[in-house]
Amino acid sequence: MTNLRKSHPLMKIVNNAFIDLPAPSNISSWWNFGSLLGMCLILXILTGLFLAMHYTSDTTTAFSSVAHICRDVNYGWIIRYMHANGASMFFICLYMHAGRGLYYGSYTFLETWNIGVILLLTVMATAFMGYDLPWGQMSFWGATVITNLLSAIPYIGTNLVEWIWGGFSVDKATLTRFFAFHFILPFIIMAIAMVHLLFLHETGSNNPTGISSDMDKIPFHPYYTIKDILGALLLILALMLLVLFTPDLLGDPDNYTPANPLNTPPHIKPEWYFLFAYAILRSIPNKLGGVLALAFSILILALIPLLHTSKQRSMIFRPLSQCLFWTLVADLLTLTWIGGQPVEHPYIIIGQMASIMYFLLILVLMPTAGTIENKLLKW
């Protein structure tokens, strides 16, 4: 008789994806982030479900309902902070996961990569709408500023913004629809993530060398299940240190002031994980130009497979490309820092230089480095 996990229609799918899956024998800890992202998503859906039981999406009661969750609901404070800081962990894992794909050339799996880009955009939309729900000052003004960017679209811009708002300003209708979208999107993300995994398992995982590992595969279980559990424990440790010791470290103090349309905060800024894109947006002194740069700063990821000029897949044996890759990482950290600073000298010029550098590295320098490396190797 065949083993049940190999014969049962449902168990068979799980078996082929997580148990008997042939995996490369040499994948490093950089390959842990996929499973960590799955864990972050499940954590956020579960904590979000319990938060939604007590939250009210009405402008008059939203702020107090969040305060009520933190003060009066059993363990409400820990659920709320696990949800908020879980989102930060989600983005750390996302950026690490995408960075790994960039470094080791995983983007040559076109379908998997492009679905990953769609996932990134969907997660960013979800996080943005979630940040608006507590209805503090930064929630309200963040929602106003970011949705207002769409008014830069010629001809239909203003109508589009008012349609999204459900009125002539960010108000009750906006908050209600943002809550509805914030609730449904994680389930859509889960579905897209399954398609992401489906396409990945069509080709099998990449590995640090970037060459085929068909001749040396090992079963996913127990080797990588144990490795993933270690990663999960470290992630939970980091998250709980954040939640239990400094829950507001990554938040904005302005969000503890109830939303007031008549009083603009001195520095409107999004959550830390959007600061790099916000810095690119602010570095262009033209509204439409800034919006286009903002959109392109994320969508540029979809172009990366087309910009791959090297005859080697991974960067592991390409020192020139490695230097440029880590320059890009440093540049993104610089942009993240600038995004949180006020719009004044010298931050303006630093932001503009870092924005130019970002696009220059991806569109020009990295493809050129790939060609130079081919020439140096006489390929």
UniProtKB/Swiss-Prot annotation:
One of its GO terms (molecular function) is metal ion binding. Heme b b566 binds at H97, H196. A ubiquinone binds at H201. Its cofactor is heme b. It is found in: Mitochondrion inner membrane. It is a multi-pass membrane protein. InterPro entries: Cyt_b/b6_C, Cyt_b/b6_C_sf, Cyt_b/b6_N, Cytb/b6-like_sf, Cytochrome_b, Cytochrome_b_C_euk/bac, Cytochrome_b_N_euk/bac, Di-haem_cyt_TM. Keywords: Electron transport, Heme, Iron, Membrane, Metal-binding, Mitochondrion, Mitochondrion inner membrane, Respiratory chain, Transmembrane, Transmembrane helix, Transport, Ubiquinone. Heme b b562 binds at H83, H182. GO terms for cellular component: mitochondrial inner membrane; respiratory chain complex III. Binds 2 heme b groups non-covalently. The keyword Glycoprotein does not apply. It holds the Pfam family Cytochrom_B_C. Coiled coil: none annotated. GO terms for biological process: mitochondrial electron transport, ubiquinol to cytochrome c. The chain crosses the membrane at residues 33-53, 77-98, 113-133, 178-198, 226-246, 288-308, 320-340, 347-367. Belongs to the cytochrome b family. Component of the ubiquinol-cytochrome c reductase complex (complex III or cytochrome b-c1 complex) that is part of the mitochondrial respiratory chain. The b-c1 complex mediates electron transfer from ubiquinol to cytochrome c. Contributes to the generation of a proton gradient across the mitochondrial membrane that is then used for ATP synthesis. The cytochrome bc1 complex contains 11 subunits: 3 respiratory subunits (MT-CYB, CYC1 and UQCRFS1), 2 core proteins (UQCRC1 and UQCRC2) and 6 low-molecular weight proteins (UQCRH/QCR6, UQCRB/QCR7, UQCRQ/QCR8, UQCR10/QCR9, UQCR11/QCR10 and a cleavage product of UQCRFS1). This cytochrome bc1 complex then forms a dimer. Heme 1 (or BL or b562) is low-potential and absorbs at about 562 nm, and heme 2 (or BH or b566) is high-potential and absorbs at about 566 nm. PANTHER family: CYTOCHROME B (PTHR19271:SF16). This is Cytochrome b.
